[in-house]
Swiss-Prot record:
EC number(s) given by UniProt: 3.6.5.-
Gene coding for it: obg
Organism: Streptococcus suis (strain 98HAH33)
Main location: cytoplasm
Residue stretches making up the OCT domain: 359-437
Protein name: GTPase Obg
Annotated Obg domain residues: 2-160
Length: 437
């Protein structure tokens, strides 16, 4: 059996915008032709697209880095560089994307064909044709392309199913799934047979249909990661109805009621909302000796934990192997699904707000100043660093423009207020220059 991978850590990087060009029009009979350098092309975005044909995150085990192409540089004759194509990354249905640095959820991808731009490409730098003014009709100024967005991500896959089969290993979940659907799970008489969630479609005699997932076997301590643990619990989050399968034959020497309590405790510990999902108790292996006695004992113990005003869960005695009692179970499941709404997986506070990439945030400081151990001044801040990376330092006019932008942002004044003196070293990233007062 191929390994099932339901979490992955990857890095995505959008394409850098193409650099703008400095060029001048030089044609016969056109004296003083003026600037003619075009803009760079837009960098490619990284786009996640949901593909219903994918079932695991296995591909991300071998390919963890995804980089979109950069935009083309601007050209002469005022021609713009070509924008790069987006990089399409296909993911399975049910993939949750988190920011690995903040832990916040970015998006939940559940519909086939759904698209989400996970990293935005940088805009192209402007060519010198953009900087012409009456005072400076032939500027030697251009911009570098803007860097593409770069992100560290955690992908998490939760299978999409209406109904989840839960229960201890070897209670007969895989057998039940194979009987009620066309799924062909691998079945064996040993624990942890099911490592991969198996999905199957059920169609009842009345024409109702729904998806069922036989999820990896659960043991006590799963919510703390014991055994297959949180892998199992992650997948049950998307189900609307839970079929709690119990081995009423007690063939492995366990008490069915104790199994029932233990599994519910794990569900509650992992996520309190899991217990809001309606459960149907499936009393399996009723064709085995003493199963009837165990079922009666189970019902008595169950009743003691409910008061007279509470409704007991439905119990359906079945035998997966002997194909007994299945029709009633499936009809009841379809009826319960009909009146059970979908559950919100996450609270709104779990999601990270995705700001417009070029949006203005008035609360965000334009720059920050700190002092290094060697007494140099360090300038930082998203806006300032973006201006820096887009400045073409090969052109004197571009450097002078950058200096004017710093003054306009109040950097010179702020440095003086912090005590900077003529000749002090100021750093932005790896670039350093002298402060001139």
């Amino acid at each position: 059996m191929s390994m099932f991978l339901d979490t992955a850590k990857i890095k995505v990087k959008a394409g850098k915008g193409g650099d703008g060009m400095v060029a001048f029009r030089r044609e016969k009979y056109v004296p003083n032709g003026g600037p003619w350098g075009g803009d760079g092309g837009h960098g490619g975005n990284v786009v996640f697209v949901v593909d219903e044909g994918l079932r695991t995150l296995m591909d991300f085990r071998y390919n963890r880095r995804f980089k979109a192409d950069d935009g083309e540089k601007g050209m002469t004759k005022g021609m713009h560089g070509r924008g790069a194509e987006d990089l399409i990354v296909r993911v399975p249905q049910g993939t949750t994307v988190r920011d690995a640095d903040t832990g916040k959820i970015i998006t939940d991808l559940v519909e086939n064909g759904q698209e989400f731009v996970i990293a935005h490409g940088g805009r192209g730098g402007r060519g010198n044709i953009r900087f012409a003014t009456p005072k400076n009709p032939a500027p030697e100024i251009s911009e570098n392309g803007e860097p593409g967005e770069e992100r560290n991500l955690e992908l998490e896959l939760k299978v999409l199913a209406d109904v989840g089969l839960v229960g201890f290993p070897s209670v007969g979940k895989s057998t039940l799934l194979s009987v009620i659907t066309a799924a062909k799970p691998k079945i064996g008489a040993y624990h942890f047979t099911t490592i991969v969630p198996n999905l199957g479609m059920v169609r009842t005699k009345s024409g109702e249909s729904f998806a069922v997932a036989d999820l990896p076997g659960l043991i006590e301590g799963a919510s703390q990661g014991v055994g297959l643990g949180t892998q199992f619990l992650r997948h049950i989050e998307r189900t609307r109805v839970i079929l709690h399968v119990l081995d009423m034959s007690a063939s492995e020497g366990r008490d069915p009621y104790e199994d029932y309590v233990a599994i519910n405790n794990e569900l509650e510990t992992y996520n309190l909302r899991l217990m809001e999902r309606p459960q149907i108790i499936v009393a399996n292996k009723m064709d085995m000796p003493e199963a009837e006695e165990h079922l009666e004992e189970f019902k008595k113990k169950l009743a003691t934990n409910y008061d007279e005003f509470e409704e007991l869960p439905q119990i359906f005695p079945i035998s997966g192997i002997a194909h007994q009692g299945l029709e009633n179970l499936l009809e009841a499941t379809a009826e319960l699904l009909e009146k059970t709404p979908e559950f919100l997986l996450y609270d709104e506070s779990d999601f990270q707000e995705e700001e417009a990439y070029y949006g203005f945030n008035p609360d965000e400081p334009e720059f920050a100043i700190s002092r290094a151990d060697d007494a140099s001044w360090i300038l930082s801040g998203d806006k300032l660093e973006k201006l820096f990376t887009m400045t073409n330092f090969d052109r004197d006019e571009s450097v002078m423009k950058f200096a004017r932008q710093l003054r306009g942002m109040g950097v010179d004044e702020a440095l003086r207020a912090r005590g900077a003196k003529d000749g002090d070293i100021v750093r932005i990233g790896k670039f350093e220059f002298e402060f001139v007062d």
